[in-house]
Amino acid sequence: MYPAHLLLLLAVCVSLLGASAIPPLPLNLIQFTYLIECANKGRRTSFNYADYGCYCGIGGSGTPVDKLDRCCKTHDECYAQAEKKGCYPKLTMYNYYCGEGGPYCNSKTECQRFVCDCDVRAADCFARYPYNNKNYNINTSKRCK
């Protein structure tokens, strides 16, 4: 084997090792994204909710800053209930469809139905309440006590 081939093989192996260290996204995150966009008729993408208030996004603490943030807290609590039932809400794939009235669940197993219901209720809640740009990317250490 030529030295250039060895270098190329080494580069491929190193990049594969690096890629294997990247944690995967939760499997149902894409589904939740579609449910959000279905519920609000495309007015806002799911990215608007990734870092909103004290509870939208990873983790959560303190008092929700508004009704929209309360939707995220309720969604977190719903996922906690799913885990108590032995479900894995961030990994559970489910069947749903987007109708004129918004998203609907169409899943067979109890865990799929429960997790889908959590996500549909959150998506509908997001669509129901106004979005306040001032609550996006807030300083959670100061405002979420």
From Swiss-Prot:
What the protein does comes down to: PLA2 catalyzes the calcium-dependent hydrolysis of the 2-acyl groups in 3-sn-phosphoglycerides.
Reactions catalysed: a 1,2-diacyl-sn-glycero-3-phosphocholine + H2O = a 1-acyl-sn-glycero-3-phosphocholine + a fatty acid + H(+)
> Between which residues do disulfide bridges form?
C38-C98, C54-C144, C56-C72, C71-C125, C78-C118, C87-C111, C105-C116
Q: Which domain of life is it from?
A: Eukaryota
Q: Listed GO cellular component terms? A: extracellular region
* Family designation: Belongs to the phospholipase A2 family. Group I subfamily. D49 sub-subfamily.
**Per the annotation, which location comes first and is thus the protein's main one?**
secreted
Pfam families of this UniProt entry? Phospholip_A2_1
Amino-acid positions noted as binding Ca(2+) in the UniProt annotation, renumbered to this chain: Y55, G57, G59, D76
Can you say where in the cell this protein is located? Secreted
- GO biological process: one example: arachidonate secretion
On whether Hydrolase is a keyword of this UniProt record, the answer is yes
Q: Does the keyword Cell membrane apply?
A: no
Official protein name in the record: Basic phospholipase A2 PC17
Q: What is the lineage of its organism?
A: Eukaryota, Metazoa, Chordata, Craniata, Vertebrata
InterPro entries, per this entry? Answer: PLipase_A2, PLipase_A2_Asp_AS, PLipase_A2_dom, PLipase_A2_dom_sf, PLipase_A2_His_AS
